[in-house]
Amino acid sequence: MAKKRYRKVTEGIAHIKATFNNTMISVSDSQGNVLCFRSAGGSGFKGSRKGTPYGAQMASEEVGRLARDNFDMRRIAVRVKGPGAGRDSAIRGLRSAGLEVIHLEDRTPLPHNGCRPRKKRRV
């Protein structure tokens, strides 16, 4: 069976959503079409280990390798969303996969006193 042909995309955008329970990374082209996706849960981490920085780094290394090998991607802009623990380590994982980070943007949604927040945890 022949290997699937991918189109060449040299620059892309990495969308990182870091929640407290998981970290999702998707790589798209400049128009926003998703090329590849990986999460910490999809990288083999289960339960509370999905929300760790190590899980985010492994997922971003995998998605970075996919983007580099399949789409010949070299440069990437990063958009981070969410308060999770895997924010910085996901960016580090993309760099270690051989991608050059050209732009870094924080898109965490902040309410202008909108909905009432969740109750405080009592441990």
From Swiss-Prot:
Part of the 30S ribosomal subunit. Interacts with proteins S7 and S18. Binds to IF-3. Belongs to the universal ribosomal protein uS11 family. One of its GO terms (cellular component) is ribosome. One of its GO terms (biological process) is translation. Located on the platform of the 30S subunit, it bridges several disparate RNA helices of the 16S rRNA. Forms part of the Shine-Dalgarno cleft in the 70S ribosome. GO terms for molecular function: rRNA binding; structural constituent of ribosome. This is Small ribosomal subunit protein uS11. Keywords: Ribonucleoprotein, Ribosomal protein, RNA-binding, rRNA-binding. The gene is rpsK. HAMAP family: Ribosomal_uS11.
